[in-house]
Every structure is written in structure tokens, then in C-alpha cells.
Amino acid sequence: MRKSPGLSDYLWAWILLLSTLTGRSYGQPSLQDELKDNTTVFTRILDRLLDGYDNRLRPGLGERVTEVKTDIFVTSFGPVSDHDMEYTIDVFFRQSWKDERLKFKGPMTVLRLNNLMASKIWTPDTFFHNGKKSVAHNMTMPNKLLRITEDGTLLYTMRLTVRAECPMHLEDFPMDAHACPLKFGSYAYTRAEVVYEWTREPARSVVVAEDGSRLNQYDLLGQTVDSGIVQSSTGEYVVMTTHFHLKRKIGYFVIQTYLPCIMTVILSQVSFWLNRESVPARTVFGVTTVLTMTTLSISARNSLPKVAYATAMDWFIAVCYAFVFSALIEFATVNYFTKRGYAWDGKSVVPEKPKKVKDPLIKKNNTYAPTATSYTPNLARGDPGLATIAKSATIEPKEVKPETKPPEPKKTFNSVSKIDRLSRIAFPLLFGIFNLVYWATYLNREPQLKAPTPHQ
């Protein structure tokens, strides 16, 4: 006969079930436990990496050359100073190299760290050769990023603002183009110890953000990269170079300088259409335009460095100044011939009237009597005595030849000079030809995108 299960059997069954469920719950760690375990593992990895690590020694010392791969992301380019020949650039500067001492094994493949870890390991001593002032951003914390992969490859990124030199050749100003370089390399390590390479192909090694241009007077045409070797007294060093190609915008200078110069030259030629007797008006035109050109030439040079050669704008202003000054000289020449009374270069409108010649007097017996004029005495008729006296007193006139004087040159009034007529055609024609040649020469020049490579 089978025995029915008792109370003790049910109790044992419940105890077994609870123990099974409890064992499963203990076998699955909570999220807090997982985070605690990851932090512990992370700390142990970092401690193990820095254990015995000497950041004074470069990777591969005595075995191989340390290769540093670089690339640049430009967040802001500009402004550019023509007077100081420099430019300002804001970049994310990335460097990557391999350090076998920092290999690790763990649940993660990449260690994402900040600037605190960067100060405890070896980093390249990169500096900018043509930098006047470089600033590493530290607000609110130093803007530095460090990544370490499990094979010991490091990525080190910094945000920098660099003010660098930009040598400019201003012969074609303001239709000029420039290649502003950014040169960097190792300060202490020669190419036998540290070499630099671009991370990607040249077209992608330096990238400028689409909204990164901060230029008012230039267009950023593009950038090119290069590398070379620089020889110094301490050895040969690898230098990485990036050229930013700029083309100046001419609109500002057309409004500020070129149009005023052209209008001033045209204004000086208005005097050719005034009568040459209008001395005050033509004098005002000449003197005013000369002074205006002098002011324009001085103001055009204020924004440029004091270079020892003439720029394209200087040549334009000089030619305009020559036209204005020539117009003043032309008026002086016309006025000179007008005052001398020469009629060879004008039309005589009012002929000169002949002068009356007075009768000459002949002195006779201490008295003066006209020689060519006889007077009929008004004598009373029928008085023979008076008639005899009058007859004896009459003086026989002598024939006197009139004096002949050389004809004086005719003076002209309200006339037009032949010099003015010629100037009305010659001056505008020559000025138009000059502008055609000037603008065709400078505007058709293509900017040189290839900059000189560093000395090797």
C-alpha cells in the first residue's frame, strides 16, 4: 500500500525551489556591480600601463624611428593682416603614433582619456616654425583628447589658435594672390629619431570647415600640403608644410581708389572745353585735381606695409597723376600764348581797328603850325586890306609821308586754341588705351596655386 506525501515532503520541495531561484539571482550581477567591476578593471589597466613607464624616453628608443602621423581640421581661418604680413588660424591639431609600452588587454579595445593622462606619457614636441604666437585653449578645461588602443597606438588632439607669418609679394596689389604657409615639426628630435607623415592622402590631410573662412578681403581658394627637410646647426629636421592659397577681392579698392582716380582724371579734362580766356575756372580745375590725386595716393598706401617697390595700384595712381598734371601744364601753355597775343593757334573774331594819325606840326619862327591842314580865313567881303594880309599869312603845306608801322599780331577773344582741340581727343584716347591695357594685363593673370617647396 502506497504512502501519501506528508507535510514534510511539501516543505522540502519549497525549500529546494527557493534555493534554486536564489542561486540564479546571485549568479546575475546587478548594473551597479558591473560598473564597479569596469572601473576597477579600467584603473588596474592604467596603473599597469604607467608602472615603470618613463615619459622622458621616446617610443622605440635605440630600436626604430618614431613615426608621427598628423592631420589638421581648420575651424576658423582669418583674419589676414597685410600690414603685419600674418594670419590667424584656429585648428584641431591631431597627432598619432605607436608606443609599445602602452599595450594592454582587457574588456575594452580603446581607452578614452583626457589631458591628465597626456601629461604622464611621452608626446611629440611639435612646434610651429613660422608661428608668432600659439595658444592652447584651456577653458573650461584644457582642450585635449587622448585615445589609446590595445595595440599601443595613440591619438592626441589639441585645439590651438596660431598666429603665423605669411610672406607677401605685393607687386600685383590689389589683384594679388598669396600662399600662406603653416610649418611645423619636432623641436628637439632630428629625422634620425622622429619623422612626421600625413595621416591621409594630401587632399584630405588638411580640411577647412565650410563656414570656417573669416576673410573680408580674400577668397580662400584651397590648400596644399608638402613635407621637406630643413638643415640646421644641430642636424636635419623633418618639416611639414601646409599652404593656404588666397586671392584678394578687388571690390573694395575699386570703390575706394580706382573710381575716384578715374573720375578725377575725367574732371581734369573738362578744362579743355572751356575758353582759354577763362583763367580762374581752368586754374581751379587744374589745382583741385592735382591736390585730389595727391590725397588719393597717400590714403592708398596707409593699409599697406612700407615696401620698397611699386604695386599695381601705385602704377595706376602714378599714371592718373601724370594725366592730371599734364592737363594743368596744357592750360599753362595755352594761357602763355594767349597773353602773348599770338593768333596762330586760334581764330580772330574781332579785328583790330586802325588808329588815327594826328597831323604833324612844324616849328617855324617859334610857332607851331599844322603842315597838312589849311584854314580858310573868315574875312569880310569887300575888305581888300584884310584879304592881302590873309593871303600873306597863309603857309604853304609841305608834303609829309605818313609813318609806316609794322603790323601788330592780331589779338583773339573768346577763341578756341588748337592745343585744346587736340587735347580733347588725345587725352581721353590715351587714358582709355591705358585702362584697357592695365585691366587686361592684371585681371587675366591666374593665381599661382603651387607654392615653393621647402628646402631639401
Curated annotation (Swiss-Prot):
GO terms for cellular component: chloride channel complex; cytoplasmic vesicle membrane; GABA-A receptor complex; postsynaptic specialization membrane. Residues 1-27 form the signal peptide. Keywords: Cell membrane, Chloride, Chloride channel, Cytoplasmic vesicle, Disulfide bond, Glycoprotein, Ion channel, Ion transport, Ligand-gated ion channel, Membrane, Postsynaptic cell membrane, Receptor, Signal, Synapse, Transmembrane, Transmembrane helix, Transport. Its main location: membrane. Allosterically activated by benzodiazepines, the neuroanesthetic alphaxalone and pentobarbital. Inhibited by the antagonist bicuculline. Potentiated by histamine. The extracellular domain contributes to synaptic contact formation. The GABA-binding pockets are located at the interface between neighboring alpha and beta subunits. The gene is GABRA1. It catalyses: chloride(in) = chloride(out). It is a multi-pass membrane protein. Disulfide bonds join C166-C180. This is Gamma-aminobutyric acid receptor subunit alpha-1. It is found in: Postsynaptic cell membrane; Cell membrane; Cytoplasmic vesicle membrane.
